């Protein structure tokens, strides 16, 4: 087995026993990136030289007995996290040459534990998309089928795990942007509860929805990564001051007596038959393990996508107002005046989907429409939140599909934004409710594409969904399947 194929916990054991060094593991990963990157395009920036220096430092730490679960582990980050001295583009022309002067909190926490950054990953521009086709740096391909999308917006984060180009990655999830690509690429992806992980230093898309989370090869790795980045941060006023549990201790493999809810609004006509089959098999697996099932209702699910595309675009139009060519980012050389510079820098710097969402959001916030659209959307959001609260009075976790279909072909939905938006129909409600959800590999379609299972927990119920996901993993082998690149 090559070093680049190992999980965090497998590589940690080898590093601890001094069977391998972090430099060797990092060299193996960099060679793997070089070999498969032309096919996948998961990275925007590869930080090879710095990675080898950091790996040498990690080896010193290990020799001195100062070792954490992540010391010497090669990781990669979605290019939405600010990284001191390393270009951060958010996959946009407007930030093509932006080099941040500081690290995001989650990046600083990984570095403090001795993780080795091998690069920054491709995504949809400003995290707006479900397919990683809108990046200024070119589309990313799904390692399971290079003609298919990896999902989005954290497509690079999932594709890099599927292609074994990083041991673990971090992404962000605003409406499904970790869980949907994890499902399409056969990885584990966790969207924590809003406020569980600091957003400081993460380029904002929709501030009341964005959340940082890991994409990994198995649930144990996911728990290790969440332990590392979770916790209160005074620099983010929305981060919650709660102790961080040892998530790995929750992985008991036991779900006997666990009450699992099946939301009737998620098992709808039109669900891809391969997805339905994977869900039926997952339910049967949980029954064999002693879990109990109950049908529940989340009646306002039908309004989730419309609500999301008002709230998220309104927040995006406000957040993206800061990109004007004045202090940082792309500045138009054609401008004749200050106003002209703002206009032309933004026109040249933003891609089509970003412009579409800025216009949608600006319209929703405009005078005379604020009450009709934005305010009404926030009220419906509250109803969606109450649906989850009521459901969790009856059950411990919810089980649903992640996406209505397996990965679709590149270019299939780019001409129809509404079709693209509907691919997040099962993930968006979790963001609107501010709770947590995880995607776990649960099957393959007849075409050989991965299908993910979504487990949704109560707010700050990450231990519950990690335990349930880990138990499923112990009784199936889907997480061990690898894309044949």
Swiss-Prot record:
EC numbers: 6.3.5.7
Q: Name one GO molecular function term.
A: ATP binding
**Gene that codes for this?**
gatA
Q: Which family does it belong to?
A: Belongs to the amidase family. GatA subfamily.
User: What protein am I looking at?
Assistant: Glutamyl-tRNA(Gln) amidotransferase subunit A
Top-level taxon of the source organism: Bacteria
| Enzymatic reactions | L-glutamyl-tRNA(Gln) + L-glutamine + ATP + H2O = L-glutaminyl-tRNA(Gln) + L-glutamate + ADP + phosphate + H(+)
Assembly and binders: Heterotrimer of A, B and C subunits.
User: What positions does UniProt annotate as the active site of this protein?
Assistant: 78 (charge relay system), 153 (charge relay system), 177 (acyl-ester intermediate)
Q: List the PANTHER family hit by this protein, alphabetically.
A: GLUTAMYL-TRNA(GLN) AMIDOTRANSFERASE SUBUNIT A, TRANSAMIDASE
Disulfide bonding pattern of the chain = none
Keywords attached to this entry: ATP-binding, Ligase, Nucleotide-binding, Protein biosynthesis
Enzyme class, one word?
Answer: ligase
- State a single Pfam family of this protein: Amidase
Is this entry keyworded Ligase? Answer: yes
Q: Which GO terms describe its biological process?
A: translation
């Amino acid at each position: 087995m090559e070093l680049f194929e190992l999980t965090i916990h497998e590589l940690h054991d080898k590093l601890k026993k001094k069977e391998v060094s972090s430099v060797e593991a990092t060299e193996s990963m960099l060679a793997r990136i070089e070999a498969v990157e032309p096919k996948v395009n998961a990275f925007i920036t590869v930080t090879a030289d710095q990675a080898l220096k950091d790996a040498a430092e990690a080896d010193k730490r290990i020799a001195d007995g100062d070792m954490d679960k992540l010391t010497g582990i090669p990781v990669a980050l979605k290019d939405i996290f600010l990284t001191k001295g390393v270009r951060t583009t958010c996959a946009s022309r407007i930030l093509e040459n932006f080099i941040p002067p500081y690290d995001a909190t989650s990046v600083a926490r990984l570095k403090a534990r001795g993780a080795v950054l091998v690069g920054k990953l491709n995504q949809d521009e400003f995290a707006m998309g479900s397919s990683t086709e809108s990046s200024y740096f070119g589309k990313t391909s799904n390692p399971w089928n290079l003609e298919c999308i990896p999902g989005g917006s954290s497509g690079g984060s999932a594709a890099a795990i599927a292609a074994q180009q990083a041991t673990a990655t971090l992404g962000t999830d605003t409406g499904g942007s970790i869980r949907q690509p994890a499902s399409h690429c056969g990885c584990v992806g966790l969207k924590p509860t809003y406020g569980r992980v600091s957003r400081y230093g993460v380029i904002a898309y929709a501030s009341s929805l964005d959340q940082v989370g890991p994409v990994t090869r198995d649930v144990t790795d996911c728990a290790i990564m969440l332990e590392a980045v979770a916790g209160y941060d005074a620099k983010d006023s929305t981060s919650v001051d709660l102790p961080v549990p040892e998530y790995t201790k929750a992985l008991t493999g036991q779900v006997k007596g666990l009450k699992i809810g099946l939301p009737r609004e998620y098992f709808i006509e039109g669900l891809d038959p391969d997805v339905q089959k994977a869900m039926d098999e997952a339910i049967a697996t949980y029954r064999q393990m002693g879990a109990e099932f109950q049908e529940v209702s989340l009646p306002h699910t039908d309004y989730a996508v419309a609500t999301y595309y008002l709230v998220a675009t309104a927040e995006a139009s406000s957040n993206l107002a800061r990109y004007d060519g004045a202090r940082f980012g792309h500045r138009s050389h054609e401008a004749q005046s200050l106003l002209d510079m703002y206009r032309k820098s933004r026109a040249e710097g933003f891609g089509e989907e970003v412009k579409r969402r800025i216009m949608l959001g600006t319209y929703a916030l405009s005078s005379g429409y604020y009450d009709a659209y934005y305010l009404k959307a926030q009220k419906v959001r509250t109803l969606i939140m109450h649906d989850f609260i009521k459901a969790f009075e009856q059950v411990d976790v919810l089980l649903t599909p992640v996406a209505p279909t397996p990965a679709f072909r590149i270019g299939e939905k780019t001409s129809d934004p509404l079709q693209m938006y509907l691919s997040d129909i099962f993930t968006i409600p979790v963001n609107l409710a501010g709770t947590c959800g995880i995607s776990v590999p649960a099957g393959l379609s007849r075409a050989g594409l991965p299908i993910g299972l979504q487990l949704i927990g109560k707010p700050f119920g990450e231990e519950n969904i990690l335990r349930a996901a880990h138990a499923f993993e112990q009784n199936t082998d889907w997480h061990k399947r690898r894309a044949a690149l």
